[in-house]
Amino acid sequence: MKQFMLAGVSSGVGKTTVTLGILKALADRGYQVQPYKIGPDYIDTAYHSRITKRPSRNVDSFMIPDDQSLAWSYYKWHGDADVAVVEGVMGLFDGLGTDKDCASSASVAKKLGIPVVLIIDGKATSTSAAAMVHGFATFDPDLDIAGVIINRVASQTHFELIKGAIERYTDVEVLGYLPKNATAELPSRHLGLIPDVEMDDLDRRFEDLGAATAKHINLDRLLEKAELPDKRMTNPFRISNDQPLTLAYALDDAFHFYYEDNLDFLRELNVQLVPFSPLKDKELPAADAYYFGGGFPEVYAQELMANADFRASVKKAHEQGRPIYAECGGLMYLGELLEVEGQVYEMVGIFKGKSLMTPGLKSFGYCQAETQVDSLFGPKGTAVRGHEFHHSVFETEEDTVLKLEKVRDGQVVAAWTGGYQKGRTFASYLHVHFYQDEQLLANWLDYIKEAN
């Protein structure tokens, strides 16, 4: 089995570009490629899936702190694949705080036992690149740095200069490069790359990127260095559900942030998933419960407001006591109002208050939460790990039901409250991965059964 991680020396070096190019080039060769993403990102995984035609999976060691559960989130999915490609997050050793082994790409690579290919930015550098590679290669002797790929290289001559320096001063093999004009830069906005569903020319960009990758990166050598013994493991989770349930979930251009593992976990527990569109459908489908994931309701605020019949059906389901769970963009939709650039749009109105878009991030990163009331997560005092990433605030006088903290290097660096519960509707900015604790999902299913 061929497995490797692509990790940058920092954010912004072109790690995602290189990853997409390699995914495309390998897929063009006929390989079945299983992609993964370290950390909580939803958008990169959608790009991976677009190329490989396989759902990309998040491998997140903060939200999934148990090593067995973390390994399951990785090994479960590539048994029928030829190659597993893992895209790192931020810089190789960047994680939570200053501990290089806390939620970093490096720590996950060591836990999984896979080699790392380092991505560096070749723009305006030559021999200094060797010092950078040397530092990364020697910083953690337990980490296998199998090679380096140089991004944004000006010319073949420039590549030979950097390659010569790295191979003169380090033992790390240079596997190739991408030229600075390999493809037009992928556009982004406040939450990172623009989602693939909003890109009209994405497949053409992928074709260009795949061709440049095949031309300039030694894929044969990369795959040689990535060959590892097959490893299989058994499912560490023990929960079960004998009662068939139906969960309808929002899935369209406005709402599409879901962890694939969460959806598959639900399916494995006898839950039928039914997608619906708050943009296009006239009413909610019949279901035992409803799930509104994150996304970009602010981009589609006019269309969401215009679909008044659908909004009314959501509020009716709430009033009838149907369990509703919403994360981030889902919270914004279930609120009363959404303000974008001075324009105010009516939303569902389950929670009184207004979501207001902000110029900067209002919350970013991992956090630990504790429920202050009995909820779908379980009894009061239930611990939940999650991730927040939003350019908005929810201005409301509704009571909060979560106590949240951000902890770095053992110290609480921020504390706040959030999350709202009214009847059987629960909404917060927190994105949650259920592999962290199977009991959270068991509690949610019990909560749904009690309501029905």
Swiss-Prot record:
Gene3D superfamilies: 3.40.50.880, P-loop containing nucleotide triphosphate hydrolases. The active site is at C328 (nucleophile). Its EC number is 6.3.5.11. Its cofactor is Mg(2+). Pfam families: CbiA, GATase_3. Residues 246-439 form the GATase cobBQ-type domain. The record marks H431 as: Increases nucleophilicity of active site Cys. Disulfide bonds: none annotated. Comprises of two domains. The C-terminal domain contains the binding site for glutamine and catalyzes the hydrolysis of this substrate to glutamate and ammonia. The N-terminal domain is anticipated to bind ATP and cobyrinate and catalyzes the ultimate synthesis of the diamide product. The ammonia produced via the glutaminase domain is probably translocated to the adjacent domain via a molecular tunnel, where it reacts with an activated intermediate. Belongs to the CobB/CbiA family. Catalyzes the ATP-dependent amidation of the two carboxylate groups at positions a and c of cobyrinate, using either L-glutamine or ammonia as the nitrogen source. The a and c carboxylates of cobyrinate are activated for nucleophilic attack via formation of a phosphorylated intermediate by ATP. CbiA catalyzes first the amidation of the c-carboxylate, and then that of the a-carboxylate. This is Cobyrinate a,c-diamide synthase. The gene is cbiA.
